[in-house]
């Protein structure tokens, strides 16, 4: 949204900065940081109040989880996704479809997690939604996003894979690009899901991933 302020610029004032992605990326970083500082405690306190005993602990996990994680509220992803969504809508360009694709995928997988956590609390067990259902929904979200990307891309690039570091290297995967992209999206989402529950929960891998993006 703030990107449009650059239209007020005469070329030599502060409004001109909003056209540069580096400036807006820095602004998004500090906005997310401020969002976390301002809302983390109120949201955590609200979750603790509503959930009382916290999330149900899995029986097949480490023994110390039963004592260390007891009373820990679930649904903390609301804070992470809220921070990401707020800073994105504030600093990103609305005319770029990739922004909306990323937001769609993030909200889609976030909704799966929210429903899963809600199911655990409602049924008072650690099972939540079955893994098969989560995986199937995740594949549909990833497939839709992949086809969306292909539709908006130049036909000569729509099935091509860029190789990091090597600027001019493009691997044309053909139709294999679709299952490959779906696998990467679903695999990335589930790697965070599998990491969640260990020390540090999901926030550290999410932070490390989002900082470089």
Question: For the regions a protein language model found, what residue spans apply to each?
Answer:
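"…together with the soluble PPM/PP2C metallo-phosphatase catalytic core" -> "…together
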Residues: 2-211
């Amino acid at each position: 949204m703030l990107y449009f302020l650059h239209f007020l610029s005469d070329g030599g004032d502060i409004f001109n900065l909003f056209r540069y992605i580096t400036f807006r990326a820095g602004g998004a970083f500090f906005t997310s940081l401020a969002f976390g500082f301002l809302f983390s405690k109120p949201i955590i306190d609200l979750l603790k109040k509503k959930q009382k005993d916290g999330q149900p602990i899995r029986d097949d996990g480490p023994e110390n989880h039963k004592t260390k994680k007891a009373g820990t509220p679930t649904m903390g992803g609301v804070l992470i996704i809220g921070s990401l969504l707020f800073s994105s809508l504030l600093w990103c360009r609305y005319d770029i479809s990739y922004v909306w694709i990323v937001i769609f995928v993030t909200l889609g997988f976030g909704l799966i997690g929210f429903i899963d956590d809600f199911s655990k609390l409602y049924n008072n067990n650690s099972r939540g939604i079955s893994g098969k259902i989560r995986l199937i929904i995740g594949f549909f979200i990833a497939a839709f996003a992949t086809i969306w990307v292909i539709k908006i891309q130049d036909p000569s690039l729509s099935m091509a894979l860029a190789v990091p570091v090597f600027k001019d290297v493009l691997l044309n995967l053909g139709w294999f690009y679709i299952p490959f992209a779906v696998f990467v999206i679903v695999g990335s989402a589930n790697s965070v899901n599998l990491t969640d529950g260990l020390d540090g929960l999901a926030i550290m891998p999410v932070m490390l991933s989002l900082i470089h993006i």
